[in-house]
Design a protein with these regions (language model features):
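ABC transporter nucleotide-binding domains
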Residues: 1-265, 269-589
């Protein structure tokens, strides 16, 4: 076998803290060869991102590092900052998790890409570097690349910003690419496009690639080899087929088992690698263990012909209307007692606007919202305040939703205090709430910062349950959680739905999660509901083209299926540009 592009031997990284030394990476070793894609997989805190920063030489100064890292036979730990700078962006490049933070907001995107070319190839003229930037933007699939090159990062969508980051990463044809959670913040369809693009770029360049991720579905379609990390150490490594079909370690099996499968019904999923963890969550659409038929159960929430239109204005001193944005455009649905309706769609489709219209309990611009049969526009201020105990919400980011200065007991008591509960009843209720969401009574005295992400989300659910609501709105409640933690939260929600008879409006863009918690699905696009039906009907026989697009974009944790779905999406002719790639290539002399 040829010499590896990247060799990591016995890498250890630690940081000082007020509680002692934190060992972020312990004795990690691996190699990546030319044209090979290695995925480093693990949950938050496993050390995977720290290991990639060590390779790039981007660790903070207080880090203690030992071991050895070689890139093309050169020992990185013996290099100074100047020598490392000549490698970054030229021989080795990185695609970061948050492109908006990685791109400079005050410079045009094209200029930032051109700068990467000229830093490593000063002989290239400014005009040629600018043309090269346009060629690269065209190669990664950005429409109207000449115009887009003159725009700023905030004028790009999230997917376009990540495409621009990939263009920057491949500008000098690096030997090594590191991608750190490149699709975490993206919708499922954009995620699929970005991963196809990254794989196409890697294969075109023949670059060695390290993908850092916690998403096993993404790994299946990208990696040749997989390295699994837990608590700073390597648990298992092997070929992608070996890891997915014949995992040796229990932790690897648990990671795979926790991944929801969008392609399998539960009867099939229970036989698969990924079926076991969610088997006890719910059969798809079987969370309705309520024996009464749906039509005979009372309606908890009814939305009829709802509209929310925002004017588009222009002008500084005198603003004039030049158009309108139909954020919600005539949608209708209802939720019955003990039922979970999933509202799914990409960013900008109107999901969050719909959620806010419901939670504000105010008269809509047009249409009607009824809670327990009562029109919200007919409510007095006092009646509206009382109704807020019937409709509660669990937010996407549990840390931002909980007051860090309040102990958990006070957080749970706050909504009860507003509704006039007695002290004795609140104390009893706090203990019951903690037990109901799988926490311990002693957790009541702790603060949010003392909990993990999954535990904080359980606190958020407990707070939503505090006043016996009829409906809980769940706004992307598991999107910020690791896959194993996500499975536990989903299991808890499904159990609460069955045990307490509470109804859910589950807002999400993750169809694989939705299948295992919802009874019915409403698919939104551009402010409209394009499909509404029972979960299994939508998954097995989607009627709308957009529903089929969403389903086809969901990553499936099966390498064989993922390989069949892979597409080459990079424009190779645009990448080479007029006169070939040498004008901006890392191989230029």
């Amino acid at each position: 076998m040829s010499e590896p592009i990247l060799s990591v031997r016995d890498l250890s990284v630690s940081f000082p803290s007020e509680y002692g030394t934190v060992h972020a990476v312990s004795n990690l070793s691996y190699e990546v060869h030319k044209g090979e894609a290695l995925a480093i997989v693990g949950e938050s805190g496993s050390g995977k991102s720290v290991s990639s920063l060590a390779v790039m030489g981007l660790l903070p100064r207080n880090a203690t590092v030992s071991g050895e890292i070689e890139l093309l036979g050169r020992k990185l730990f013996t290099m100074d900052d100047g020598q490392l700078s000549t490698l970054r962006g030229n021989t080795i490049s990185m695609v970061f998790q948050d492109p908006l933070s990685a791109l400079t907001p005050v410079f045009q995107v094209g200029k930032q890409i051109a700068e990467v070319v000229r830093i490593h190839h000063p002989e290239v003229s400014v005009s040629r570097a600018d043309r090269r930037a346009i060629e690269l933007l065209e190669a990664v699939g950005i429409p109207e690349p000449a115009r887009r090159a003159t725009q700023y990062p905030h004028e790009y969508s999230g997917g376009m910003r990540q495409r621009a980051m990939i263009a920057m990463a491949i500008a000098n044809e690096p030997e090594m690419i590191i991608a750190d959670e490149p699709t975490t913040a993206l919708d499922v369809t954009i995620q699929a496009q970005v991963m196809d693009l990254l794989k196409s770029a890697q294969e075109m360049l023949g670059a060695a690639t390290v993908l850092i991720t916690h998403d096993m579905g993404v790994v299946a379609g990208f990696a040749d080899r997989v390295l699994v990390m837990k608590d700073s150490q390597m648990v298992e490594t092997g070929g992608v087929d070996e890891i997915f079909y014949r995992p040796r370690e229990e932790y690897t099996r648990s990671l795979l088992a926790a991944v929801p499968r969008v392609d399998l019904a539960e009867s099939e999923g229970s036989k698969s690698i990924a079926g076991s963890a969610l088997r006890h969550v719910a059969d798809p659409a079987a969370g309705s263990t309520v024996s009464t038929p749906r039509e005979q159960r009372p309606t908890v929430l009814e939305v009829e012909d709802l509209h929310r239109i925002y004017p588009i204005t222009k002008g500084a001193l005198v603003r004039r209307k030049i158009g309108e944005q139909r954020a919600v455009d005539g949608i209708s649905f209802d939720i019955r007692e003990g039922e979970c309706l999933a509202l799914v769609g990409e960013s900008g489709c109107g999901k969050t606007t719909t959620l806010m219209e419901i939670m504000q309990l105010r008269a809509p611009q047009q249409g009607a919202i009824r809670v327990n049969g009562t029109e919200v526009q007919d409510l007095t201020r006092k009646e509206r305040a009382a109704l807020r105990s019937d409709v509660t919400i669990v937010f996407q980011d549990p840390m931002a939703a909980l007051d860090p200065r309040m102990p958990i007991a006070d957080i749970l008591k706050e909504p009860m205090r507003v509704q006039g509960y007695t002290k004795e009843r609140m104390d009893e209720r706090v203990e019951w709430l903690l037990k109901t969401v799988g926490l311990l009574p002693e957790h009541a005295a702790r603060f949010p910062t003392e909990f993990s992400g999954g535990q904080r989300q359980r606190v958020g659910v407990a707070r939503a349950l505090a006043c016996d609501p009829k409906l809980i709105v769940l706004d992307e409640p598991t999107s910020a959680l690791d896959v194993t933690v996500q499975a536990g939260v989903l299991a808890m929600l499904a159990d609460l739905k069955v045990r307490l008879g509470v109804s859910f409006l589950f807002v999400s863009h993750d169809l694989s999660v939705v299948r295992h918690i919802s009874d019915r699905i409403a698919v939104m696009r551009k402010g409209k509901i394009v499909e509404l039906g029972d979960t299994e009907d939508v998954f097995s026989d989607p009627q709308h083209e957009y529903s089929r697009e969403l389903l086809s974009a969901v990553p499936i944790p099966d390498p064989e299926i993922a390989r069949q779905r892979r597409r080459d999406v990079i424009d190779r002719s645009a990448f080479k540009g007029v006169g070939g790639a040498a004008a901006g290539a890392g191989t230029a002399s």
